[in-house]
């Protein structure tokens, strides 16, 4: 992206790290991309894209797997929670329990044949939280999929013309955070009609820190 200089992104990340007050917890580094002239009411204008970052943020990402059989057995070794078919059936009509699971899970990986059941029980609680169930084939390597999604972020623009996601943590090397930012920006570039025009601002900030705008060309 020629209009987003790497040195400008690097400078913004360094400044965000320097000016943010220290907290008694590990802060995330967030990327905010402000868009313009995008019709969010049209299907073409909505953005909902999973991005696998090249450098996983040093913050635990909770992965839940909805599966049965052999996949459920293997998932118990790597996932933060495994939801069996019986547990999903128990969520029918139990919105409170579904919401609790949706709040706990950052990602929900679903064995494909359980998607209809997840759609009826868990998906209504995931949607308002900007989360979606991810279907995988019954013979998928669940350990590899869980590992991959620990590095994943969701790009989403639905109600506001902007995309916000975590691209690192304050204890990561600056160059890794910058790499992650460019992975997000390149993904966005492929989804926008005219990235140079549609991207109005690129902002970096820590969880509790002030925003720092990247100087675009």
Swiss-Prot record:
One of its GO terms (molecular function) is tRNA binding. InterPro entries: Ribosomal_uL1, Ribosomal_uL1-like, Ribosomal_uL1/biogenesis, Ribosomal_uL1_3-a/b-sand, Ribosomal_uL1_arc. Keywords: Repressor, Ribonucleoprotein, Ribosomal protein, RNA-binding, rRNA-binding, Translation regulation, tRNA-binding. SUPFAM superfamilies: Ribosomal protein L1. GO terms for cellular component: large ribosomal subunit. It comes from the Archaea. The keyword Glycosyltransferase does not apply. GO terms for biological process: regulation of translation; translation. Part of the 50S ribosomal subunit. Binds directly to 23S rRNA. Probably involved in E site tRNA release. Belongs to the universal ribosomal protein uL1 family. This is Large ribosomal subunit protein uL1.
